[in-house]
Amino acid sequence: MVETMLNCDIKDIALAEQGKNNIEWALRDMPVLRSIQERFIKEQPFKGLRLSACVHVTKDTAALCTVMKAGGADAVLVASNPLSTQDDVAAGLVKYWGIPVYGYAGESVETYREHVRVALEHNPNIIIDDGCDIMATIYEEKPELAEHIIGSTEETTTGIIRLKALEEQGKLKAPAVGVNESLTKHLYDNRYGTGQSLFDGIFRAANILIAGKTVVISGYGWCGKGCALRAKGLGANVIVCEVDPLKALEAVMEGYRVMPIADAAKEGDIFIAVTGDKHVVDVEHLLNMKDGSFVGNCGHFDHEINVKGLREHAVEIKQIRPNLEEYKLDNGKSIYVIAEGRLVNLVAAEGHPASVMDMSFANQALGIEYLVKNQGKLPNKLLTLPEEVDIMIAKIKLDSM
């Protein structure tokens, strides 16, 4: 492996050796992605193409980027969250794989946005998005770049919502594959990955007992289902807040209590927002919570919990532990906010295990290949990968277990 130094904006290149070890450790547990990499090395499907990826900079996403580069892509990676970057991984990608990385843990929101603009300066043909940041920024700030784009893939429910809005407004100028719609993504990553990594983050941040607590889950999509399942397994009393009657009925059938967040606010001990929407846990809910309640977010953006509004009612904000703040409120209560209201599992922990991300990122890699192979033949709409791709990924995964 050749050591390389590139233009980048990372915390410390001296962390590269540990990052290399972590990336290789992740790849060890990603047999589907490894099999795709072997084929990409031979076929070079992305030779001559520029790739901009805006994803969480973790050992698992790094593995995906190395696979894309192995397939010939001229890749640039920027962080999709100001707090979730694993700095050793960023350094490892720069030094040992020659992939420029722009992102470091604790960067300001302004720096994060500038890094997204770096992805645009790469003038990409293909895009891997996590939250639709690159695509949305292109259409808002540099729509002329759209004519060079073959297509994009989107990892998250939140990003899918934004892409659907762009499509409805007639602004989507290139096909986009909604990876989140693939069965081998949302049935496993969203459910089993989110459920496990959420509580990994809570344990690291607060080290609290879950058994006997009342855990309130706002949102009962696949991520919410996974969070509720793991909370129940840990001995919690689970309340689900869900506006979709079909999903709410499913939650009831699973044995959970279902009620509006306004009612649940008075009963819960731990509150998790996992909807993809804004201010689902709003100021009035936060003020009505019991003294000593914990709140955390497992949706992509940090606006699901109205932390800004909560801050206006705080007489004191105290850092208790890394990734845990106590908000002493003007009503005499204290509320504990995990990871500043950003993604608990990626800020306070390391995200999902590599094994489950293996399938998600296989969909990303094959989604980009699908767009390239069908260039000029696909409508400028939000698309889903063909069923045979799901089946192939599932078969490879099963054979490895």
Q: Which residue stretches match the model-derived regions?
A:
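Glycine/serine-rich phosphate-binding loop and adjoining beta1-alpha1 elements at the start
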Residues: V2-F46, L77-K213
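Adenosine-phosphate binding glycine-rich loop
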Residues: E3-L6, A14-P31, F46-R50, T58, ...
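Rossmann-fold NAD(P) dinucleotide-binding segment
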Residues: S35-E38, K69, E121, M135-A136, ...
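Active-site cofactor/substrate anionic-group-binding motifs, chiefly glycine-
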Residues: R50, C65-S84
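Glycine-rich phosphate/diphosphate-binding loop of Rossmann-like nucleotide-binding domains
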Residues: V55-A73, K185, D189, G193-H279
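Short acidic, glycine/serine/threonine-rich loops at helix termini
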Residues: L64, D88-A90, E114-H115, A136-P143, ...
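ADP-ribose/adenylate-binding Rossmann-like module
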Residues: A79, I126-G131, P143-T158, D277, ...
